[in-house]
Structure formats: structure tokens, C-alpha cells
Amino acid sequence: DYGHQVVSVMLSCNGITLNYAVILYDKSRSKIQIVQEIAEELPAAPVISYFLCDSWYTTAKVMDRFIRKGFYTVGALKTNRILYPCGIRQKASAFALHLRKTDPDVSLVTVGSREFYVYRYEGELNGIPNAAVILSYPKDGFGNPKALRVFLSTNAELSTQEILDTYTKRWPIELFFRQSKSKLALDSYQIRSRQGIQRYWLIMSLVHYLCCMHSGNYCTFEEGYASLKQQLKQEQFANLYRLIKSSASFEEAFKFVG
């Protein structure tokens, strides 16, 4: 088998979410270094902005690089991340074992259509002087270590609800990969050269952009893809009609269709 690892970044502003970069991870530099370099490329945020990520990228180095550009971080944390509740060093997973539904600091919140029990910790993490950390369990999975999820915000002024709602906005990057695999052959192309791979990803990103912006107004990728597909089909039939109308031979028409 032969595969490639990808680091992808999406930018979102005023309801418009587009692919910003698709970068080949070839182990010549770490994923952390790649994301740090992307942060350096970004212009300073003109308003309060957020870097949304999974637990791979919630490291002090990455978050520091983004905060310098005016981006707070809202991301997932690994459950073995060290916290300091009451000044006592503990893994988040170990601390969560002591939580009870009846604790005054444990509350039930709704995110989307689901309910979660949450506990909020504010304070120090290794390499981070102050952040808000949310320990959460699904309503029906409270106390189950495998169900524990941990989230972080370097903007401690956000409420627990705001942190969780903000984190859900990173879903478009998951959709981008799913759509690129199902519609743009991300998981089935057969290219080995680095240059060829990068060229393909560039074309793929361009097609994704065209699908989202083809009408001059932003729409979902699925809507744009369906519309462009229909437009291409109409153009093909129109060209075939003109060819037949010009008294083209059967062989010429067959060659055009085939």
C-alpha cells in the first residue's frame, strides 16, 4: 500500500468557509512545525478570532504562535493532559474520576441536539499560564472514562457554552476531507511524485473553491458540485445537439460522446 499524510487548514469568516492550505506531511518537519509556519503566514486578525483544532495541535508552541497573530485557540485536549486543580498536579482523566453529577460545579449543557455533563477548570497547564478547560461526558455516559472528552480555550472569558459551540464550528474541515474523498478522488488518485501530488491537491482545492463560489455567492460544496455537474451535462448535450444539427456523421457524434 502507498499513502500520503495531509495537513489541511480551512479559513472561515462571515459564514464563508474555504480551504486555505493542503500540505504534504513527509516527516522532514513535524505537523506541529507545519502549523506553526502556517500561523506565521496569516495576517494579524483584525477582530477576535479563533484557531480551532483537534488534540494533536493544542500544544503550547502552536497556541503561542497563533496568539501572537491575534488568534485564541479552542481545541480538544488529550485526556492525559496535566491540570493543576487547587495546585495539585493531575491528569485530566484522573481528576475526572472524582467528579459527581451532584457537584455544584458540574452542570448539564446542550450542544446541538445532545446533552453533556460538564465541569469547568480555569488555571495553569504546562506551558500555558491560564486557560479554560472543559471536562465533558455525554448525558448517558457520565463517569465512563472512555466517554470523557476534554476541551480547551485560551480565551478564558468565553462561557462553557460558548467554548463548546465554538468547537463544533471545526466540523467543516471534516466535511472537506469527506467531500474530497467521495467527490474529488482524494482517496483514490494514483500519483507518487511529490510535484504531481502537490499539483493534484492544488487542482482539487481549486475545484472545491469553484463549487463553493461558482454562482458568485457562497454555497455549500454539495450544492455547488451538483449545480456544476448539471451545468456541464447541459453543455455536453448542447454541443452534441449542435454537432448533430450540423450534419455530422455517426462516427463524429460517437467520438464526441465517447
Describe the residue ranges of each PLM region.
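Single, function-defining residue in the core of a domain
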Residues: 12-258
